[in-house]
């Protein structure tokens, strides 16, 4: 009986600690999307959205989302990338 009481106490303590770990605010340590290489220019009609990479990334970049839900990395300094971003912002 004493063993089962101890086991129950350990189980409850473990559950309490796990609950606190999993209740951390979303985004506290979430991974960031970074670009390690850039894609060539892709047709504008395939692009539906974009977001900029985090400032924590080693290379700045833009990630375009395609109609097929793929992510394409692009160099934010390139002219075509800036044109696509402007077009997406105007048509949002």
UniProtKB/Swiss-Prot annotation:
GO terms for cellular component: cytoplasm; cytosol; extracellular space. Residues 1-23 form the signal peptide. Expressed in lung, spleen, and pancreas. Disulfide bonds join 34-57, 35-73. GO terms for molecular function: chemoattractant activity; chemokine activity; kinase activity; phospholipase activator activity; protein kinase activity. The keyword Secreted applies. Keywords: Chemotaxis, Cytokine, Disulfide bond, Inflammatory response, Secreted, Signal. InterPro entries: Chemokine_b/g/d, Chemokine_CC_CS, Chemokine_IL8-like_dom, Interleukin_8-like_sf. It is found in: Secreted. GO terms for biological process: astrocyte cell migration; calcium ion transport; calcium-mediated signaling; cell activation; cell-cell signaling; chemotaxis; cytoskeleton organization; eosinophil chemotaxis. Monokine with inflammatory and chemokinetic properties. Binds to CCR1, CCR4 and CCR5. One of the major HIV-suppressive factors produced by CD8+ T-cells. Recombinant MIP-1-alpha induces a dose-dependent inhibition of different strains of HIV-1, HIV-2, and simian immunodeficiency virus (SIV). Self-associates. Also heterodimer of MIP-1-alpha(4-69) and MIP-1-beta(3-69). Interacts with CCR1. Belongs to the intercrine beta (chemokine CC) family. This is C-C motif chemokine 3. The gene is Ccl3.
């Amino acid at each position: 009986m004493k063993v089962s009481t101890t086991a129950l106490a350990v189980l409850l303590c473990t559950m309490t600690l796990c609950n606190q770990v999993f209740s951390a605010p979303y985004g506290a340590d979430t991974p960031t999307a970074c670009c390690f290489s850039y894609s060539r220019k892709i047709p504008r009609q395939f692009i539906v959205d974009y977001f900029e990479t985090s400032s924590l990334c080693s290379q700045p970049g833009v990630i375009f989302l395609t109609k097929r839900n793929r992510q394409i990395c692009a160099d934010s300094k390139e002219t075509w990338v800036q044109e696509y971003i402007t077009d997406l912002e105007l048509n949002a």
